[in-house]
């Protein structure tokens, strides 16, 4: 088996996690109490969904997941909510005091006390796996727990499980919408850790997803639940081929192989189609070609950045539902002829496609329509550097005056870490610039050597 352990950190991680597990349960026909009427092999069994769920001898399906937060309120909602019987109580770990939007609290003071307990629970889950494939980690980089504790845990996972892939879903601060004044500090410090300790990071930002919900689903005031259900569809599409059988399956390691040209350049942009409400879907059904065009639209991106300003290095297209390889080939051929979609000159093909016959499920009473086919695109583009330069700029404005820095130093952090992290991000922006630059002719390159 190729099992995967999901780790949900902080409020953002936990709430995205709730939406994901709600959707996985629906897709596999697992009830909120963990029973699965359709599953004939009770206790164990080698079904495809066992990558995400372990089975007990009584036929209960338990998510291979851990929730961690430094304060209890968000996870208490799971302990009392609809899915309270789904998770093992030991999988929900909470501290008593929160990280107060402070990276240093999450990483040094408060986080230190709880990290060994968390790693112990991770080890227990890992011991139940016959062939652990990797980790999916969910967190935000703007808060204190997600940024500080998130990077602490990733560092420790690198030590204990060096060879396993770590895929990271991180919610980045939006350009306009901010939830904390010190977001830029936390994000820069956290990204510094993500650069080293994750294999692939998927960037999400609330503002981009708000706009998607508003525009495509006609929700006037989207709530986090609306956003998270959309994110859950993306994450579900990424993991479908791990949980169901399909025509072109995509393994977790294949993401890395196909999307990451250089180890540091591993920040991905995600987009998803069709995002349509039930009323609209009644009148239209999107073809493979239309879906393929839609995911390349800047308005479909899950992070605020315009791919037309950069070049693509690689794209992963995951189709699901009623899709045949012939249609996919035709759709990709059309995309390749478009002038607006530019690839770097050293990566001429750049497409990896996956097809899965499992049609997308939707949460009953949710906003998304039930459709026959859907497409999720993960792309590695130089445009994502926009996200970093935005955060860096805000960081510089505050750090020039050393505003709020005493809160971090007071929690045992050294001021040097700020400049170290900031320099690392400056180098990252430069890396993206170089990757997108035109390759010089061989003769010139040799002269420069």
From Swiss-Prot:
Q: What the entry says about post-translational processing?
A: Acetylation of alpha chains at Lys-40 stabilizes microtubules and affects affinity and processivity of microtubule motors. This modification has a role in multiple cellular functions, ranging from cell motility, cell cycle progression or cell differentiation to intracellular trafficking and signaling.
What's its catalytic activity?
GTP + H2O = GDP + phosphate + H(+)
Binding of GTP: at which residues?
A: 11, 71, 140, 144-145, 179, 206, 228
Q: Which UniProt keywords apply?
A: Acetylation, Cytoplasm, Cytoskeleton, GTP-binding, Hydrolase, Magnesium, Metal-binding, Microtubule, Nucleotide-binding, Nucleus
Q: Where is the active site?
A: 254
Where is this protein found? Answer: Cytoplasm, Cytoskeleton, Spindle; Nucleus
Task: Write the Enzyme Commission number(s) for this entry.
Answer: 3.6.5.-
Give one Pfam family, short name only. Answer: Tubulin_C
Cross-referenced InterPro entries? Alpha_tubulin, Beta-tubulin_BS, Tub_FtsZ_C, Tubulin, Tubulin/FtsZ-like_C, Tubulin/FtsZ_2-layer-sand-dom, Tubulin/FtsZ_GTPase_sf, Tubulin_C
Where N6-acetyllysine occurs along the chain?
A: 40
Superkingdom of this entry's organism? Eukaryota
Q: Which SMART domains match?
A: Tubulin, Tubulin_C
User: GO CC terms for this protein?
Assistant: cytoplasm; microtubule; nucleus; spindle
Q: Which cofactor does it need?
A: Mg(2+)
Which Gene Ontology BP terms does the record give? microtubule-based process
One example of the protein's molecular function in GO is:
structural constituent of cytoskeleton
| Role this protein plays | Tubulin is the major constituent of microtubules, a cylinder consisting of laterally associated linear protofilaments composed of alpha- and beta-tubulin heterodimers. Microtubules grow by the addition of GTP-tubulin dimers to the microtubule end, where a stabilizing cap forms. Below the cap, tubulin dimers are in GDP-bound state, owing to GTPase activity of alpha-tubulin.
Which family does the record claim for this protein? Answer: Belongs to the tubulin family.
* PANTHER family hit by this protein: TUBULIN
The record's misc note reads: The source of this protein was the multinucleated Plasmodium of the slime mold. At least two alpha tubulin genes are expressed in the plasmodium.
The entry's protein name is Tubulin alpha-1B chain
Q: Which organism is it from?
A: Physarum polycephalum (Slime mold)
